[in-house]
């Protein structure tokens, strides 16, 4: 709800209030002077009225030392605005207005305070005091109430107030006491915060809250020289970072003492100088000029020195504002943006033992690094091995024995314990450079009872359950004397056998054990003697793949020999324990058959893979081989098929190439067959379609049947592989002549020409058959299609057909042989229609 009262809003409120007051004052001055104070009896005349309700009107203006023209102008505007606002508000109580226009004529650092008496008698005044102000870009609302009682020549008062920093969301309550008499005013206040820490609006990584504290005000005047007076104020606040002298100068439990001189030569003008001194040599000096205009009094009295004495009396201070600090003094707290602790925080163990330690980080930002102060630790032989950004392995350093004379009598090892105790400190730093408080890790190295060394023989033996690895532990005292007949417990991990055994040292302090395993990898062997442990790692090597437990697969087993389609080889090697065999570096895939290309082998989490491509048609056998030994029982076969391709065209006993543009002539019920990969037997392995299914359909044998004219359009016949659906082959043709018999009766050349009308026949006989009887896809009817007698007799009657050798030379052609007889009287008309 307080967000409404931002700086701009407060500025607008005060500005509009000033403008409104100015208008009201100019129009209704006379009318207001005739009204009665709302909680007082009516007075007899305007002078008494103004005397009763306009006790104190003050305007304070601080003069800048530099005093340029702009400052003087703003000062004049400030003074005028203050006087007009006070003039209007003082009709309803006492106001103090501080209107500060800056260079842009905004109202930053302005304030308005209003004391409103709501019960007023000769002995008591009950009042409310309201205020609103802007300071340091914070808007503060003050709401208070109090009572003043008058006993003989003294006034005693008590007041309380609520202060609300609406901008920064800070709240406090204030309690004050007053004791005033003629020429002397004593005031004391206490301030108590109402809210706790929250994010500061002044600093990014700080919290803020009101600082609790108090102040004492003393103001006195000389009875003999009432124009001259002085003031003293002491204020102190509690807290570690308190902004008593501003947010840029934070102090711990700061205090300040303010002393000042007041000089009022005439009632209209008051001069003053204040000196404020505080902790750590803080020092401020302020010069003040105050101009007071007392309503209802004559102009002469405003400038009469004799009137000054009356203003120092208690009767004139009845409605003065409460002397207190309305601005909330803030305390700041550096946010602990990152915290560091260790778990565990204390380690205790024998030399060489390894412990895991985790850094517990609480941070608003990501961790950048942890800085260790471990020089003493490292020098002693300790190790701090990072496992991750927050996890460490701590390896304890050797124990430091001391000479017996250095030990405390009766407390063996006490001084040694101090020498063998290490404190490691660390600081965590986040990505913004914020540091945590140092965290400590205490490490206590215990005095060992034994010195245990280890020796491993035949490390790296096969994990076949038979081949052993021998581990020998030697146990001695600190002085290297062998420890005989000492019982110890040996345990192993990761499937090594025996998993646990109890044995005694021999005369040389030696305990030996032979280990076997079916599990590949590292096994930790631990010797425990009276709680003191020593460990050593042994490694069992991989067993070779067993052909019975292993598997090999190729997918797919059929591919196209285009050098692109892949078959994936997947080999899952398992040893005789049915364990997956990892780390094979000598795996190969051996091929036998048509040549193929095999990619490098890739080891995955649970298999080994490679890919196969080829360009040759046929079969190839693939066999995995490990260490030079082929696993023949796992052999798999891959068949490579030819790339789908239309290699020829069968037409009435002849086969044409696919690049000759066949057919150029077509006729009803003409037919031809496409040949896939050099053999029509392959045609059934494909699904056939035609782009002109109505006029040029194709059957499942790849036979194209001409059913109607295509009118010069390109016909596309597509063969899609049934085994490899993404692979297709196409053949396109575009006929340019549609040929037909003009009639079913024999006619003369003249009649045939008339029957076929404008058809040009010459192209139909430009065939090598006219000279040597051979066929070719040359665009001629018989050259492309051969004997017409093999086609539908209903379309082609048996006999000769008229055509033209030249534009005027008619000849006849035998429909069966393509021969051109020397002479013929009649024949069937052969017509051709362009498409």
Curated annotation (Swiss-Prot):
<dbReference type="InterPro" id="IPR008964">
    <property type="entry name" value="Invasin/intimin_cell_adhesion"/>
</dbReference>
<dbReference type="Pfam" id="PF07979">
    <property type="entry name" value="Intimin_C"/>
</dbReference>
<dbReference type="InterPro" id="IPR048658">
    <property type="entry name" value="Invasin_D4"/>
</dbReference>
<comment type="similarity">
    <text>Belongs to the intimin/invasin family.</text>
</comment>
<dbReference type="InterPro" id="IPR016187">
    <property type="entry name" value="CTDL_fold"/>
</dbReference>
<dbReference type="GO" id="GO:0009279">
    <property type="term" value="C:cell outer membrane"/>
</dbReference>
<dbReference type="Pfam" id="PF02369">
    <property type="entry name" value="Big_1"/>
</dbReference>
<dbReference type="InterPro" id="IPR051715">
    <property type="entry name" value="Intimin-Invasin_domain"/>
</dbReference>
<dbReference type="InterPro" id="IPR013783">
    <property type="entry name" value="Ig-like_fold"/>
</dbReference>
<dbReference type="Pfam" id="PF11924">
    <property type="entry name" value="IAT_beta"/>
</dbReference>
<dbReference type="Pfam" id="PF21764">
    <property type="entry name" value="Invasin_D4"/>
</dbReference>
<dbReference type="InterPro" id="IPR038177">
    <property type="entry name" value="IAT_beta_sf"/>
</dbReference>
<protein>
    <recommendedName>
        <fullName>Invasin</fullName>
    </recommendedName>
</protein>
<dbReference type="Pfam" id="PF09134">
    <property type="entry name" value="Invasin_D3"/>
</dbReference>
<comment type="function">
    <text>Invasin is a protein that allows enteric bacteria to penetrate cultured mammalian cells. The entry of invasin in the cell is mediated by binding several beta-1 chain integrins.</text>
</comment>
<dbReference type="InterPro" id="IPR003535">
    <property type="entry name" value="Intimin/invasin_bac"/>
</dbReference>
<dbReference type="GO" id="GO:0007155">
    <property type="term" value="P:cell adhesion"/>
</dbReference>
<dbReference type="InterPro" id="IPR015217">
    <property type="entry name" value="Invasin_dom_3"/>
</dbReference>
<dbReference type="InterPro" id="IPR024519">
    <property type="entry name" value="IAT_beta"/>
</dbReference>
<dbReference type="InterPro" id="IPR003344">
    <property type="entry name" value="Big_1_dom"/>
</dbReference>
<keyword id="KW-0472">Membrane</keyword>
<dbReference type="InterPro" id="IPR016186">
    <property type="entry name" value="C-type_lectin-like/link_sf"/>
</dbReference>
<keyword id="KW-0998">Cell outer membrane</keyword>
<feature type="domain" description="Big-1">
    <location>
        <begin position="451"/>
        <end position="541"/>
    </location>
</feature>
<dbReference type="InterPro" id="IPR013117">
    <property type="entry name" value="Intimin_C"/>
</dbReference>
């Amino acid at each position: 709800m307080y967000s409404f009262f931002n700086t701009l809003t407060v500025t607008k409120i005060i500005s509009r209030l000033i403008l409104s007051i100015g208008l009201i004052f100019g129009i209704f001055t006379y009318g207001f002077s005739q009204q009665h104070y709302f909680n007082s009896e009516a007075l007899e005349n305007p002078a008494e009225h103004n005397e009763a309700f306009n006790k104190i009107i003050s305007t304070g203006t601080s003069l800048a030392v530099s005093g340029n023209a702009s400052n003087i102008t703003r000062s004049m505007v400030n003074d005028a605005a203050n006087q007009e606002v006070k003039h209007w508000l003082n009709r309803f109580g006492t106001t103090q207005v501080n209107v500060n226009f800056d260079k842009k004529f905004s109202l930053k650092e302005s304030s308005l305070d209003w004391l409103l008496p709501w019960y007023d008698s000769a002995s008591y005044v009950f009042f409310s005091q309201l205020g609103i102000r802007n300071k340091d870009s914070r808007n503060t609302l003050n709401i208070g109430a109090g009572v003043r009682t008058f006993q003989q020549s003294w006034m005693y008062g008590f007041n309380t107030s609520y202060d609300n920093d609406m901008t920064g969301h800070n709240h406090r309550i204030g309690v004050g006491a007053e004791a005033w008499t003629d020429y002397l005013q004593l005031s004391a206040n206490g301030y108590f915060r109402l809210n706790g820490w929250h994010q500061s609006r002044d600093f990014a990584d700080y919290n803020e809250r009101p600082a609790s504290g108090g102040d004492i005000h003393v103001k006195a005047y000389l009875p003999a020289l009432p124009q001259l007076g002085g003031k003293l104020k002491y204020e102190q606040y509690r807290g570690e970072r308190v902004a008593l002298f501003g947010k840029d100068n934070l102090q711990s439990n700061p205090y300040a003492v303010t002393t000042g001189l007041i000089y009022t030569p005439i009632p209209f003008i008051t001069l003053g100088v204040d000196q404020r001194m505080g902790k750590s040599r803080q020092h401020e000096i302020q010069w003040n000029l105050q101009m007071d205009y007392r309503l209802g009094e004559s102009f002469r009295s405003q400038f009469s020195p004799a009137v000054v004495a009356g203003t120092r009396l208690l009767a004139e201070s009845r409605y003065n504002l409460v002397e207190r600090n309305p601005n909330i003094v803030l305390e700041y707290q550096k946010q602990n943006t990152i915290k560091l602790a260790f778990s565990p925080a204390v380690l205790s163990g024998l030399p060489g033992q390894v412990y895991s330690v985790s850094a517990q980080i609480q941070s608003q930002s990501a961790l950048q690094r942890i800085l260790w102060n471990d020089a003493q630790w490292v020098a002693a032989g300790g190790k701090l091995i990072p496992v991750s950004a927050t996890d460490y392995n701590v390896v304890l350093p050797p124990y430091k024995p001391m000479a017996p004379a250095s030990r405390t009598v009766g407390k063996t090892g006490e001084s040694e314990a101090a020498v063998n105790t290490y404190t490691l400190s660390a600081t965590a730093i986040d990505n913004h450079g914020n540091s945590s408080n140092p965290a400590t890790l205490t490490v206590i190295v215990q005095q060992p009872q034994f010195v245990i060394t280890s020796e491993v023989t035949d490390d790296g033996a096969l994990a076949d359950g038979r081949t052993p690895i021998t581990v020998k532990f030697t146990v001695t005292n600190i002085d290297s004397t062998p420890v005989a007949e000492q019982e110890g417990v040996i345990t192993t991990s990761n499937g090594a056998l025996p998993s646990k055994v109890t044995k005694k040292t021999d005369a040389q302090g030696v305990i030996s054990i032979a280990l076997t395993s079916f599990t590949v990898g590292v096994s930790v062997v631990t010797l425990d003697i009276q709680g003191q442990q020593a460990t050593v790692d042994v490694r069992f090597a991989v067993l070779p793949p067993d052909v019975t437990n292993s598997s090999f697969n190729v997918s797919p087993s059929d591919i196209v020999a285009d050098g692109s389609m892949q078959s994936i080889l997947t080999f899952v090697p398992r040893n005789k324990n049915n364990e997956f065999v990892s780390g094979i570096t000598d795996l190969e895939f051996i091929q036998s058959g048509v040549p193929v290309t095999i990619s490098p082998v890739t080891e995955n989490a649970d298999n080994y893979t490679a890919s196969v491509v080829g360009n040759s048609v046929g079969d190839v056998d693939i066999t995995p081989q490990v260490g030079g030994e082929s696993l023949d029982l796992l052999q798999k076969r891959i068949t490579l098929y030819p790339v789908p391709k239309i290699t020829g065209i069968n037409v009435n006993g002849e086969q044409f190439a696919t690049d000759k543009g066949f057919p150029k002539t077509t006729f009803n019920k003409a037919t031809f067959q496409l040949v896939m990969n050099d053999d029509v037997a392959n045609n059934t392995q494909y699904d056939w379609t035609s782009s002109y299914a109505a006029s040029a359909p194709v059957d499942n044998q790849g036979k194209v049947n001409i059913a109607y004219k295509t009118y010069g359009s390109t016909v596309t016949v597509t063969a899609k592989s049934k085994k490899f659906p993404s692979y297709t082959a196409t053949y396109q043709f575009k006929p340019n002549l549609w040929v037909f018999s003009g009639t079913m009766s024999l006619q003369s050349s003249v009649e045939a020409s008339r029957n076929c009308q404008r058809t040009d026949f010459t192209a139909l006989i430009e065939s090598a058959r006219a000279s040597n009887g051979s066929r070719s896809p040359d665009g001629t009817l018989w050259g492309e299609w051969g004997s017409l007698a093999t086609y539908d007799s209903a379309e082609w009657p048996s006999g000769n057909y008229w055509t033209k050798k030249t534009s005027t030379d008619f000849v006849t052609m035998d429909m069966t042989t393509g021969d051109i007889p020397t002479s013929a009287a009649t024949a069937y008309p052969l017509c051709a229609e362009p498409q």
